[in-house]
Amino acid sequence: MSFGSVISDARKRRSLSQKELASRIKKEDGTAISPQYLNDLERDRRNPPNQHLLDQLAGQLQLTREYLFYVAGTYPDDLKPAGTESPERVAAAFRAFRRALQK
């Protein structure tokens, strides 16, 4: 499933219009995202948003933060490399992740 279809399906399950959901998602400056921007996200015409907006979408749509980051193809800031990880540790983490997905 694409990022857009995941948020669209979750929004519909919550019986929210695009306008209602957009009004609940605030940019870093405190203003709401536009319904058109949300529409573009749902139709995969825009790249998934930043962590600030992803966290809010997860909360409003009752999706786990981890799942939403996964379908967005990104990592939360707390998982981004600090530059001290060895290539072996990173590879081991990805192998563990793949094993968990196959269960």
Identify the residue ranges that each predicted region occupies.
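A short, Lys/Arg-rich alpha-helix, primarily the initiator
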Residues: 1-16, 23
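Alpha-helix N-cap/N′ positions at the starts of helices
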Residues: 2, 33, 89-92
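Helix-turn-helix DNA-binding elements, focusing on the entry/boundary residues of the two helices
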Residues: 7, 18, 35, 54
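Short alpha-helical "recognition helix" segments of helix-turn-helix
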Residues: 21-25, 57
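Recognition helix of helix-turn-helix/homeodomain-like DNA-binding domains
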Residues: 26-48, 70
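DNA major-groove recognition helix of helix-turn-helix/homeodomain DNA-binding modules
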Residues: 49-67
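Interfacial/linker helices and their anchor residues that mediate assembly or domain coupling
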Residues: 73-103
